[in-house]
């Protein structure tokens, strides 16, 4: 069994604030403004609870073999920003981007073997917003992989 996860969004003890859903949500919560570069780029997403459930599902069902894409929401960056804006209440600023890359995945193969995702990108945004309001989620440097690794390597 090979699982090819899409971009994982939602809360984890070791947060990733450099992936689209989490990044845009943190911008809205921290600054009250979301900066979108381009916006037409599409990213596939899967909630962290669903990818965890999928791993458990596959362990419990070893008869399902092969390669499985795991991503259930192919959403443009602009649509993610709009959803964050509606949930959190932040302004969206669009700037040009020279990176038009888009990624999409089809996970019908997983649906056909009986796996059903339970959570959405909107759920992740709401959960992150609630944790931020409780003080349990902070915009920490080590949650931005490239910045953190660069600082760690060159300091």
Regions found by a protein language model. Give the residues of each.
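Conserved beta-loop-beta element that borders a ligand/cofactor-binding pocket
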Residues: 1-12
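Conserved sequence/active-site signature of Rossmann-fold short-chain dehydrogenase/reductase
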Residues: 8-10, 51, 75
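Glycine/proline-rich active-site loop of Rossmann-fold NAD(P)-dependent oxidoreductases
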Residues: 10-22, 32, 48-49, 57-68, ...
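Residue-level signal for the nucleotide or nucleotide-sugar donor/cofactor binding architecture
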Residues: 15, 19, 43-49, 72-75, ...
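Amphipathic alpha-helical segments that line or abut small-molecule/effector binding pockets
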Residues: 26, 49-60, 122-129
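Mid/C-terminal beta-alpha module of Rossmann-like enzyme folds, strongest
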Residues: 28, 54-57, 61-108, 154
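Conserved C-terminal active-site "lid" loop/helix of NAD(P)H-dependent oxidoreductases
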Residues: 48, 78-79, 98-117, 123-127, ...
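Amphipathic terminal alpha-helices
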Residues: 121-155
């Amino acid at each position: 069994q090979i699982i090819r996860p899409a971009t994982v969004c939602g809360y984890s003890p070791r947060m990733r604030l450099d992936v689209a859903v989490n990044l845009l949500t943190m911008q809205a919560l921290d600054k009250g403004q979301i900066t979108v570069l381009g916006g037409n780029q599409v990213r596939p997403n899967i909630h962290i609870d669903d990818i965890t459930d999928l791993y458990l599902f596959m362990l419990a069902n070893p008869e399902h073999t092969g390669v499985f894409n795991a991503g259930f929401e192919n959403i443009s960056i602009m649509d993610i920003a709009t959803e964050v804006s509606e949930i959190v209440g932040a302004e969206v600023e669009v700037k040009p981007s020279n990176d038009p890359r888009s990624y999409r995945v089809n996970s019908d193969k997983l649906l056909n073997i009986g796996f059903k995702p339970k959570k959405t990108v909107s759920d992740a945004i709401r959960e992150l917003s609630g944790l931020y309001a409780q003080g349990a989620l902070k915009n920490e440097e080590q949650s931005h992989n490239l910045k953190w690794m660069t600082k760690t390597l060159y300091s």
